[in-house]
Amino acid sequence: MPVIQQENGRRSVKGLPQSWGVRAYRELSAAQAGVIGPMPERYKTLAAMLDGLTDSEIPLDATDAQICMLAERWANDCASNAATIHDATTLRQRMEFICGVRGIEPPGEEDDQQVIRRCTDPAWWRRNLRKVFNRKFEHAAIRLGRVSGSAGAYVSNETVQKRISQNRRNRKALAAVTMENENGQRYQLDDLADKGMGNKKLRKGELMLRFAGCDAIAKERADVGLFVTLTCPSKFHAILSKSDTINPNYQGATPRDAQDHLTDVWARTRAQNDRDGIQPYGLRVVEPHHDGCAHWHMVMFMAPEHVEQFTKNLKRHALAVDGDEPGAHAHRVATEAIDPAKGSATGYLAKYLSKNFDDEHVGEHVDEDGTISKPKRVGREVVTPAQRVEAWAAVWGIRQFQFVGTPPVTPWRETRRIEADKIADAPDHVKAAWLACQRETTTDEHGEVVVTKPADYAVYIRAQGGVLQGRDYRIHVAERLKAVEGRYGLVDRHVPTGIYCASAPHVQYASTRYEWRRVGLAVGVGLRGPWSPVNNCTADDAPFWEAAAAYSAEVPPFDDSEWFGSFDFDCFDKFGDYNPDLFTQRE
């Protein structure tokens, strides 16, 4: 049975965050109000759920410091086994068992030594414990009704606060690191990150560019576009949208369970489409309902005569689970033909991409069930719906965007790195792909950057042989095996070096890449002779090896404030804001 505790005059359920525990206690009290004798079924069900949420080695109200200490303990457990078990294969099996009983996915490395080094590293345990804890925390929030249109859409307020704080810490950490390449160019790491797909603006722009290319190819092929919304059965939804109350059909599924269900539905539909000779291509976007349950939006292009059969196949497999429940036939699969008179397929999808990136030109977030999500004050700041969606995808590890039936994007990105002189003798389709990837700009008299020649993904698709080519695309990424020094030793990794044409794989077109190193990371360490009356030799009389040794720098007094203010610890003041000064040492 749940343990009731009292703090500052407020009773709550032990093991839950206080605001959650107070509400859970109130619901328990309401369930047993006026009851004499055996407890009613409602009380037993709620008590059993609370016991399941609080019965864990990591309580839901655990701090990040407690998770770090637990990581140290479990890493030491693995290290203790390493001291007594000397066979690498046997030791690996033992450590995989330790991970399994603690609910952690063991390392998937093939090398036994790599697995052992990870399992004896507290940092590896911290990363995995945080992931497991965050998902357990968020699942508990869903089951307790803390994720809904009224309480906080998509994710709980605590999780979105934690994610925003994490992003800020990551940004500060990147800004504090300077990188230098072999040409002597120096950049702060956050500036380098902004030049890649970690930059949301660039990522959104690339997605729009790629989909616009698909739209152009569909028009050339005289294919039609179909906008599809695919949702889960009722048992995956924790909260009823209209009443904002607990769904009696809910069976404890997580958003990842919902995503796995939709993936299975799509896999079965795709297999049936192959048997029927239907080959759709396009883009799918994963979004959360107000209660965190995943649903899909897809824009699929196909031949006009295939639309009807495609819809039948999708509905058949989507309704295979609980297809007779109320509303299933009306809401499980929704399709809408894209009308060119109302706008292009790119315009249909633009809103859904913006909802997942920056809320630009979106207006209100309106879910498929009619729930409106607006910016909401959480603590001392206003959290936008896009920030909640980003936190939702991060905590559950859900891939939000995926293209279907189009050429891979990695050769596109690698081709952009190639200099013009490297492809002078390349086949025409390689040259066409290179030209499609290049964007040319100029600066006007006001200092504004003007694009004189935009990149064209449709041309790239044609150069690759078109859509729906499977493994038969013309251009591939060239790679070489390189030994990379990592945290856990040398690892052989496939590093991209350029592209090659499938018809002549022995001819490679090298891309421009740089070797980056962190400035100021390496610190010279040398031996220092003892200073005592016994050995007080001068530099001239000292042995050559001692005279050549570098003297170590004076070590300042230890200050743990930087460590506690790093990624390893969250430090919040009474207003919920990050404040590293709380850990400043005082006399």
Task: Describe the predicted segments one by one.
Residues 299-303:
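Short hydrophobic/aromatic beta-strand micro-patches
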Residues 1-292, 304-587:
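Right-hand nucleic-acid polymerase module
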